[in-house]
Amino acid sequence: MWRLRLLVLAVLAAGSAEAQANSSDGFLEFSVGKFTYFVLSRRFPQEAVLRHISSNVTFLLFQIHSQYQNTTVSYTKTLLPSTSGTGNDRGLVFILRPEQTVCTWYLETEDTKPVQSVAVTLSYSERDPIPGGCNLEFDLDIDPNIYLDYNFFETTIKFAPANIGYARAAEPPPCDVSTGQESRWRLRYHVYQYFLPEGDLTEASLLQHLQRMAQVVQVMASAVKVVTLTADDKTVVSFSSLPGQGVIYNVIVWDPSLNTSAAYVPVHTYACSFDSVDGNCVPPGRVSTKVFSTLFALLGLFTCFFGHRFWKTELFFVGFIFLGFFFYILITRLTALKYEVRLVLTAVAGSIGGLLLVASWWRFGILTLCMLCVGLVLGFLVSSGTFFTPLGNLNVFHDDGVFWVTFSCIALLVPVIFLGCLRILNILACGIVGSYSVVLAINSYMFTSLSYITLNVLRRALNADFRGAFIRVPFQTNDYIILAVWGMLAVTGITLQIRRERGRPPFPPHPYKLWKQERERRVTNILDPSHHIPPLRERLYGWVARIKELFQKEQPAGERTPLLL
């Protein structure tokens, strides 16, 4: 019985870790290690206090988080750039004086709407490294914050170097006097990434998951370590942007000599803006993208199941991809046209590319050229999938030359491997590429990481800075379902086409030769009824004459003059 009571007390104690702040008359009281929810408003700035600080605590790290509205945390009541920080995720480090047991600071917001926030105060000892303790770039003397910047292509985080810990009342170790193992140059920085649930843009979910990224133990248990930096490296890391997908980043500074660690202030992003005019964080997406991707998916789905039988339709699909991809890269890099205009021009250019490939097959009948295009499209998807794996994050592939040469070799390897069995290559391309177009269409309606298999390659071709970005995407329940749908469509399409084409010629005959043979047969065989069909030119003249007759007035019949009496 007493064990049950202890268990209940433990659960209640754990639940109190996420409590509302004790607030009265603009006064907030915090406890070490307890996450506190409260609301900040512009009219009522708050003074925060922490009491009963233990004597073995050397410094405190306070942090406050909100979803997209800015909050300000300051050492003093008067806001100055050197004593305050403003943003969605901001924090301060408090170096404690001897015998200090109480610490105060100030919180406020300039936003007109109330800001729902969560905050926590963490304590560290003299053996723990101090995040941002060797700041030379930002305004605060000691800056534990991570500064985030994003665009459509990449998200970049940067932070100030840390310093080794020291006791109360001691002088801080110099940052750049020496580079030995007794200085801050021995420190290591582990960069972690944590994905929020896909499609979840709620404030409550973000504030809850941020609690998993504040303390060292929880960060190491919940997030994925992306890269480790030394003191010689720049404290800047880039990631591929995922618009509409919530991501939390944090940095753990580790002292290998003392085996101690400390966490910076975690920072989050959705790679989009909640308060923009377009509201681009909130679905639905662009109508133009939905129309384009849906029509493209319908053509791809038809190719997946019937592409080899309807050879010319498949060639149009392949030519559309081939020319449309390169044309979109060209106009995006060389012009400043709006997205909708570029999408329409890409659709027109892709259609021209498809018609050209069909026309070249009809006139010249060069099977090798057509299958080279088909094989390269399949090879492009295979190569994109290869670099979608952790292999793409190797440092050697951050060089554009190495990346594009390797990418091209993998893409060329696919048609070379299937050089002796072109029909199998064609059916595989129909099934895999055609079914993947459905994945791209799904991405225009709901987020799926699988679309970034090819979108990351497109981003790298469009933006030179993307080469240094780490490519990581969430793989959650929706992605497993869509991956199963993709695999099911591909396997079904390939199987049906292989069974249907048994006993048939590998490819249709040359259309132009068939047309010439048919024309010669009509000329030589006078018993053929089609021999008596007039030439095309005479038939066209006849059609034009009949159309003209429709617009001519009907002539009256009989006498035009009155009868003589």
Swiss-Prot record:
Signal peptide positions on this chain: 1-21
Gene Ontology CC entries for this record: plasma membrane
Ranges in a coiled coil: none
InterPro entries assigned: TM7S3/TM198-like_dom, TM7SF3
Protein origin, superkingdom: Eukaryota
Keywords in alphabetical order: Cell membrane, Glycoprotein, Membrane, Signal, Stress response, Transmembrane, Transmembrane helix
GO biological process, one term: cellular response to unfolded protein
Subcellular location: Cell membrane
Topological relation to the membrane, as annotated: Multi-pass membrane protein
Positions bearing carbohydrate: 22, 56, 70, 259
Residue ranges crossing the lipid bilayer per the database entry: 287-307, 311-331, 341-361, 364-384, 402-422, 427-447, 478-498
Function summary: Involved in the inhibition of cytokine-induced death of pancreatic beta cells. Involved in the promotion of insulin secretion from pancreatic beta cells. Is a downstream transcriptional target of p53/TP53, and acts as a pro-survival homeostatic factor that attenuates the development of cellular stress. Maintains protein homeostasis and promotes cell survival through attenuation of endoplasmic reticulum (ER) stress and the subsequent induction of unfolded protein response (UPR).
Protein name: Transmembrane 7 superfamily member 3
Gene of this entry: Tm7sf3
